[in-house]
Amino acid sequence: MDSSQHLVTFEDVAVDFTQEEWTLLDQAQRDLYRDVMLENYKNLIILAGSELFKRSLMSGLEQMEELRTGVTGVLQELDLQLKTKGSPLLQDISAERSPNGVQLERSNTAEKLYDSNHSGKVFNEHPFLMTHMITHIGEKTSEDNQSGKALRKNFPHSFYKKSHAEGKMPKCVKHEKAFNQFPNLTRQNKTHTQEKLCECKDCWRTFLNQSSLKLHIRSHNGDKHYVCKECGKAFSNSSHLIGHGRIHSGEKPYVCKECGKAFTQSTGLKLHIRTHSGEKPYKCKECGKAFTHSSYLTDHTRIHSGKKPYVCMECGKAFTRSTGLILHMRIHTGEKPYECKECGKAFIHSSYLTKHVRIHSGEKLYLCKACGKAFTRSSGLVLHMRTHTGEKPYECKECGKAFNNSSMLSQHVRIHTGEKPYECKECGKAFTQSSGLSTHLRTHTGEKACECKECGKAFARSTNLNMHMRTHTGEKPYACKECGKAFRYSTYLNVHTRTHTGAKPYECKKCGKNFTQSSALAKHLRTKACEKT
């Protein structure tokens, strides 16, 4: 017989069920699954060494307590014999009793016998006993019947090496059944039952039965048998449907032990935990920036490549991420699916609503360690920190002006291009920024959604409310690095620094006189002082 070794994976002949899917099967379905998997597994175990089998089997039994209990005793008995002094399986040993009380006898042929405590069947090689014991897995013993428990299977998916096992045929004393050694298991050979392997015509994977093959074929033809009753979305896997159902029910069973945040899926929790641990396993080869998720890295690499595969069919604008296109499309459709329960304001993205709600609750989670200022958004804190560091990483290629925010650069570039993509449907006025359009629309509606809790004064923009709040708190976050004088607004600081630099950017076109402030120029023009010069 050919003694060459080949790799066979149990995944080739296995049908997977998650714990959730298993609970959905009735007893008849479980019995059928058990019978099919036992047959498949026996074919592979007979080709594997005892230690390899034991490690593989026990590693897969963590979720099946009943099965682990049934198999552990057998493995302990076999361990005892393997540890006996002398050569391995075929050396004579004196009669002794295992911890389970099973008599180990010397055979007439001087070969070591292994006694199964389930049925008294005797085998002359370790792997064959393991194979035979598998047939008992799932049977109900008298002890099992008393407790109402039946042994169930949950076979591990491990790699096994096919090899030729030499020796005499193991024999079942009770049934007088001989267990012959199986031929090499390949895609061309038949199994011991003389049944041909079932082969997938698309990918050439092979399976030992038609039911396994049919389940596998779904991955190719896109069959989606599990349909959501709420929205009609279909899935090929019941576990995926269960996870999707939580979107409708609001159930979030996966809770972070650090902060209590809950998630609908375990993958969401795993990603979130990295925000606490700081783990960022996905690193960009171009710039070294690291990410918590592989998809974030994929999106990031497009910054270097300039690739923008997601194109808007309405205006032709392209995006590096599909989410960017989805959000952008809502500008054209006007869709705002996320509505605030407090004031009724709607948003195109859930994160915008989350941030908006903090205006009502007053919650500010992000605290600046330098000055103690708190922010409702993490991005607000990041931008604020640049006022301390002076960092302005985003520079205009046209004029060299730098900004601490990429969105501010994008808005600034429109000064050079003249682009005004945001147009008012009421009067046709166009704006370079979406916020400018939003503010403008309130001149038509008269809406002032942002109200001061201290004095009741209302504002059309949240930024105006934030600036107004400083009149109550006395906060002056903008300090001059030259003299230390502090100001309530950044514009005041900009004007003040010109007293140190001597810059006068505002020039009168009539007389050529320069001013440090636009208001000083406006006053100069009103008094007609330039006409006298």
From Swiss-Prot:
Molecular function via GO: DNA-binding transcription factor activity, RNA polymerase II-specific; RNA polymerase II transcription regulatory region sequence-specific DNA binding; zinc ion binding
The record's section on CDD domains has: KRAB_A-box (cd07765)
In this chain, the C2H2-type zinc fingers fall at: 114-136, 170-192, 198-220, 226-248, 254-276, 282-304, 310-332, 338-360, 366-388, 394-416, 422-444, 450-472, 478-500, 506-528
Classification via PROSITE patterns: KRAB (PS50805), ZINC_FINGER_C2H2_1 (PS00028), ZINC_FINGER_C2H2_2 (PS50157)
Location in the cell reads: Nucleus
Tell me any Pfam family this protein matches: zf-C2H2
Sorted keywords for this record are: DNA-binding, Metal-binding, Nucleus, Repeat, Transcription, Transcription regulation, Zinc, Zinc-finger
Taxonomic superkingdom: Eukaryota
Tell me the GO BP annotations in alphabetical order: regulation of transcription by RNA polymerase II
Give residue ranges for domain KRAB. Answer: 8-80
GO cellular component terms, alphabetically, are: nucleus
Query: What is the annotated role of this protein in its UniProt record?
Result: May be involved in transcriptional regulation.
Name the family.
Answer: Belongs to the krueppel C2H2-type zinc-finger protein family.
Instruction: Quote the protein name from its UniProt record.
Output: Zinc finger protein 846
